[in-house]
Amino acid sequence: MSLPFYQRCHQHYDLSYRNKDVRSTVSHYQREKKRSAVYTQGSTAYSSRSSAAHRRESEAFRRASASSSQQQASQHALSSEVSRKAASAYDYGSSHGLTDSSLLLDDYSSKLSPKPKRAKHSLLSGEEKENLPSDYMVPIFSGRQKHVSGITDTEEERIKEAAAYIAQRNLLASEEGITTSKQSTASKQTTASKQSTASKQSTASKQSTASRQSTASRQSVVSKQATSALQQEETSEKKSRKVVIREKAERLSLRKTLEETETYHAKLNEDHLLHAPEFIIKPRSHTVWEKENVKLHCSIAGWPEPRVTWYKNQVPINVHANPGKYIIESRYGMHTLEINGCDFEDTAQYRASAMNVKGELSAYASVVVKRYKGEFDETRFHAGASTMPLSFGVTPYGYASRFEIHFDDKFDVSFGREGETMSLGCRVVITPEIKHFQPEIQWYRNGVPLSPSKWVQTLWSGERATLTFSHLNKEDEGLYTIRVRMGEYYEQYSAYVFVRDADAEIEGAPAAPLDVKCLEANKDYIIISWKQPAVDGGSPILGYFIDKCEVGTDSWSQCNDTPVKFARFPVTGLIEGRSYIFRVRAVNKMGIGFPSRVSEPVAALDPAEKARLKSRPSAPWTGQIIVTEEEPSEGIVPGPPTDLSVTEATRSYVVLSWKPPGQRGHEGIMYFVEKCEAGTENWQRVNTELPVKSPRFALFDLAEGKSYCFRVRCSNSAGVGEPSEATEVTVVGDKLDIPKAPGKIIPSRNTDTSVVVSWEESKDAKELVGYYIEASVAGSGKWEPCNNNPVKGSRFTCHGLVTGQSYIFRVRAVNAAGLSEYSQDSEAIEVKAAIGGGVSPDVCPALSDEPGGLTASRGRVHEASPPTFQKDALLGSKPNKPSLPSSSQNLGQTEVSKVSETVQEELTPPPQKAAPQGKSKSDPLKKKTDRAPPSPPCDITCLESFRDSMVLGWKQPDKIGGAEITGYYVNYREVIDGVPGKWREANVKAVSEEAYKISNLKENMVYQFQVAAMNMAGLGAPSAVSECFKCEEWTIAVPGPPHSLKCSEVRKDSLVLQWKPPVHSGRTPVTGYFVDLKEAKAKEDQWRGLNEAAIKNVYLKVRGLKEGVSYVFRVRAINQAGVGKPSDLAGPVVAETRPGTKEVVVNVDDDGVISLNFECDKMTPKSEFSWSKDYVSTEDSPRLEVESKGNKTKMTFKDLGMDDLGIYSCDVTDTDGIASSYLIDEEELKRLLALSHEHKFPTVPVKSELAVEILEKGQVRFWMQAEKLSGNAKVNYIFNEKEIFEGPKYKMHIDRNTGIIEMFMEKLQDEDEGTYTFQLQDGKATNHSTVVLVGDVFKKLQKEAEFQRQEWIRKQGPHFVEYLSWEVTGECNVLLKCKVANIKKETHIVWYKDEREISVDEKHDFKDGICTLLITEFSKKDAGIYEVILKDDRGKDKSRLKLVDEAFKELMMEVCKKIALSATDLKIQSTAEGIQLYSFVTYYVEDLKVNWSHNGSAIRYSDRVKTGVTGEQIWLQINEPTPNDKGKYVMELFDGKTGHQKTVDLSGQAYDEAYAEFQRLKQAAIAEKNRARVLGGLPDVVTIQEGKALNLTCNVWGDPPPEVSWLKNEKALASDDHCNLKFEAGRTAYFTINGVSTADSGKYGLVVKNKYGSETSDFTVSVFIPEEEARMAALESLKGGKKAK
């Protein structure tokens, strides 16, 4: 083998071992040919050696040599597999024809040893072996990572696989049943002596069988002494035919086994497959025009797979030095070098070098670049001085001179507005400066090189590079990179440019679209695409208008009448051969916004014609023209087009494409497009007026949602051809869906004016254009766009934010179909620089199409290594990509990348530094203000002292400086006679604990100490010098003091005290601790213990503190010897709960995940959360997961169980002791697990379970009600374990607002008996409810359903809503009532009692449909059967009420109850006979029982005491009352069920007054009885004729007998002859007038009188004259009157 030239002359970058490396490798390759038999271990050597071994073995057996036996035993000692491997070639040795008996065969297993394959120690000289480390293997070739191909990687792969390969092969071999054993010669001789004349073959067969079973040894060593004779006794035996046949069969079996074994081992021998590279297809030379692309291809075979390196003029091509210039690919053995945009410098000889472990092979090809028509590319030269770009290591100072490139006055993150101008620039300083040689400067936007245009211009003044925007548009937004290349070195710098929308002319109008491009151009139409704007003006965008303008004119015309929403549109109506430009405007309800930037000019040409116009003559020119004349074939009708398909379909248009027919004649053809609705054969021609000239066509005015088929016909002057095959059915509508909203918006701090926002990309999004990010000040509700050009990826840096302000963010995705819904708002984040000032200068920032790391470049020069130019690579790189090589490495030392890696896969951005907006990025060494070294530790104490060492302890610094403390450094010094000595370092490596053991001290020497803390910002100031401590052996038996006391979770009545065990535990281990406390101002004798028994924990929750009191604490350790010295004091600590203090809360999310959450509003930028369990850090706990964001932290339990019981606490660093804890005991564990299960397997809450009810028509309603249901809730209806669906029998309904779920059945039949179940599913939550309808339950329900059905039929006519019933009114009357419905005037309502009509309701104009019959003073005579009948032409209904027997009794009891309740209170009334107690009721019936009691005893009725009812009065009469009648009287009215009582107290004043009244009435009665009175006989008026006699008789009474006198006209009348007055026997008075005259007329009165009283009885006497006498008297009086005149 030979090394390639460039490897032999290569200068290794590591000079410390480069010479040894190369010399060893060269030596190895020089010896490789000589030892090829040893190294390759090919199958040929194997077979030849096996043959020779077999022949030597056979000869040895025949001669039976004892010396050979000894030699063979020696050979077994050297290689355990020799004899068996030698015999494995029994039948195949002679066929190979090898007779070299001296051939040396090495053990194959040693050849597969990994160490010789890896290190090749046997190939090195003794000096080289001494210089080599034992574990270092010399590489065959050392080069830069990933950029040099060769033997290195192949060897490394073989080294790594060697051990595993041997193990695998041995395993496979062992599975074949092969064993390793050593067999002595004697055993062989014994075996041979027992065999027949075929013993030689039998012995060989056995040995061959052993060889077939071995895979660990395939070679043997056969010495020349093997030919010596063996002393062996031969015996002859007669063999039967059966034995011979068996032996022959064994030989045939052995032969087959050996063939299989050799084939198996040939497969295991990988060296048999090795072969050098071989070019199957070599690269071809090319001659191309300038600015065209060229590809060089080659195909290479070889094993291991060769590495391919491409060279240009013998210099390796670095794809990163010229990004986008070269693309190297390797796929399936085909290797390609693509050169883009060839120029004159690309004219060169190109070489493809293929290399593997077997060698190297090259193939050459030349590329010649010609300039077309002598055009001169002026863009290759810069304005100003003459420039000469440096490339491929050629510089004025020779090969690979080093250049230092620096940027000064760099441009920062910039903000512009549409329509404005902007310039980006920086000053470029290159050292050393070379005359006439200028750097190559290139500008990039999002990784795409920029070329000068009317929108952007570049300028290089010799010192400053400038990029100028003449008219900003949103298309100009992106990451801008300036890349300066000088020779093989380069440097670059990037910053982002944001372009805001211009102020709208119409308030609320949308912003302008962007990126208007031509997707496809044809002679009939051009498809235009664009991107939707981020700002819609406050109302949704209704669509877009597309405008076109012919190049050379200023006349814009609108292409569509109605706005289109899809961001693609085919513009038709174009004139073939003319060029157009386009623009797009968005419209919403407020108006039309600004137009977009115009597109690039596009010509309306057939693609083939366009390609013909752009084509150039092929090279070289031959000067020959061959013309073939054919007879024209006229009149050929073209055939049908082929490959007709729908290439694009939206709701607005459908695009068809096809291929021209093969048979079309010599003239041009045109096309007619036809359509028909799916399922019909009604074909309609779409372009009826003008045929289509191009094989593509866009159809408009199709009905959205309908399905169509299409076909195309060709036509020419000969006619219209047959139609093509119709397309498949196409539904008109947008095939592209609007993307889903992104998720998991996570903001993180970056700088003082920027925040990095990351998100989870939209799922299943197709043709995604990018994302828009919006920001809003928390609580304002006003959103502003962070980018106006969609960005790809899932990360973006939002700039231009206000420092210290809190922002929330949201993201939406966009594709051609539209913009997605907004994502959920992120958590609020305060804008401030992260620790370290944002992106670390040593870590490559993650960039994407939303470039998040807008950073300055590092302060050193890069060589031509991976740049940030391909957009996907630049903007999609990750932070963990390898950093770029330093500037000390040159191009010649780089490896050529693996051919399968393209530029797009390899390009990575250089490490850069982040700079806040508004500050120069040119000062990378400026100190960060948000982090600082920690303050000094304090309270240094000696924890334990030994004879020559001491253990120190100290307290953590009060201020940690914004980052966690990473360690401490301890210094000490001796103090001799009070004079301190020189400080010395106690530890070189920082210690992480607040305790450290300092060794190698001097016994009885006094020392002082100081401690300094360190964090990522640096080493802090040292602490104050400690007290003097004497280094001496502590011999005390009790433990030392605990240390590192800390108070946390301080509340108004409690706190947690923590400490660390003492370093010195005494003579026995520490068994516990005692904790003491006292008030800070109290005296030393005020210490009191908190625990009576020692506690084993190193923490204690102190309770019972007084709010506002300051306390100090100390801890003492105890062991078997006693209690040790108290610790240093902890505190003072004030017992108070500070405002805003929050506690750890437990949360169980929807997935059942249990977590502890804590929030702190008083965090500083340097604060962090620290979780612990039982006050031991949980940082490495596999059962817990901690996540912190902003001022919130969450600790999640992966699998909460008994192992997780304990106290969980969270401390906030860099605060004044903010902490909180949460206890999880067994009860809390059970509660949380139950809650977790409920959340993990949620159930839909149910208000009411599944129930059944019968509706009015006999329908059956199954229903249940859930607490709430979302719009996605589903219900499965199950009957007897089978799902039922809506149909004629079942009607289902779900009311998601009320949660009611219903199923209706018209009728219950016998087959409907069974179990009904409703299964609910709402998201993850499920539930079910079941009702069982079997047996009596089902029959009862079925009967009720039938009854309700009949009831519904009944209710179609006049019917009773409420049947006849009774009610007792307040007046104790009985009211019979019923409620009727559906009646009209013609309806008859008749009342019956005992089938006798008692009432007819002729006028039933009642509002409520109530019919009543009132029965007053209801009694037994009213008992009977009452009935009401409703009847009209629609039907009849009746209601019957039985008021007999028990029903009558029940009614009477209710009547009696009402009467009893109507009773008035008992009153007392005196009578002449005695005293009466009484009460009034509404009316009285006999069924109402009345009972009286006196002083709790029932009254025995007699003549003196009796009761009765008079009308409505119920009374108790007590005649001639005595004092014994005093007391409480109760009247009880019993209605048949209940007694109703009325009471009165007849005692005291009530009795006295009643009794006095009784006496008065009694006397009045006596007087009344004996009073004089007229008993009768005198009329009221007496009319008597004059002259008659009047006789009147009158009876009088009185005791004593009364005196009698008469009156006439109120005057006393005396008895005389005319008027005779008599009084006889004291009882009778006579009144007589004889000869009554008119003078006797008048009023008379009889007056009787005795001592008890008097009485007057009046009567009137009227005397009249007869008629004749009266007439005469009248005449006489008349006459007398005339005379008087």
UniProtKB/Swiss-Prot annotation:
Residues 512-607, 640-734, 741-834, 933-1034, 1041-1140 form the Fibronectin type-III domain. It comes from Homo sapiens. Residues 920-931 have a biased composition (Basic and acidic residues). It is found in: Cytoplasm, Myofibril, Sarcomere, M line. Gene3D superfamilies: Immunoglobulins. The gene is MYOM1. One of its GO terms (biological process) is positive regulation of protein secretion. Keywords: Cytoplasm, Disulfide bond, Immunoglobulin domain, Muscle protein, Phosphoprotein, Repeat, Thick filament. PANTHER family: MYOMESIN-1 (PTHR13817:SF16), TITIN (PTHR13817). Sequence repeats lie at residues 182-187, 188-193, 194-199, 200-205, 206-211, 212-217. The modification Phosphoserine is found at residues 113, 883, 887, 1054. Major component of the vertebrate myofibrillar M band. Binds myosin, titin, and light meromyosin. This binding is dose dependent. Residues 41-51, 63-80, 179-220, 874-888 have a biased composition (Low complexity). The keyword Disulfide bond applies. This is Myomesin-1. Residues 221-233, 889-902 have a biased composition (Polar residues). Residues 33-80, 177-244, 840-938 are annotated as: Disordered. Disulfide bonds join 1160-1210. Residues 182-217 are annotated as: 6 X 6 AA tandem repeats. Homodimer. Interacts with TTN/titin. Interacts with PNKD. Signal peptide: none annotated. SMART domains: FN3, IG, IGc2. Residues 277-368, 396-498, 1132-1230, 1358-1444, 1573-1662 form the Ig-like C2-type domain. GO terms for molecular function: identical protein binding; kinase binding; protein homodimerization activity; structural constituent of muscle. GO terms for cellular component: M band; striated muscle myosin thick filament.
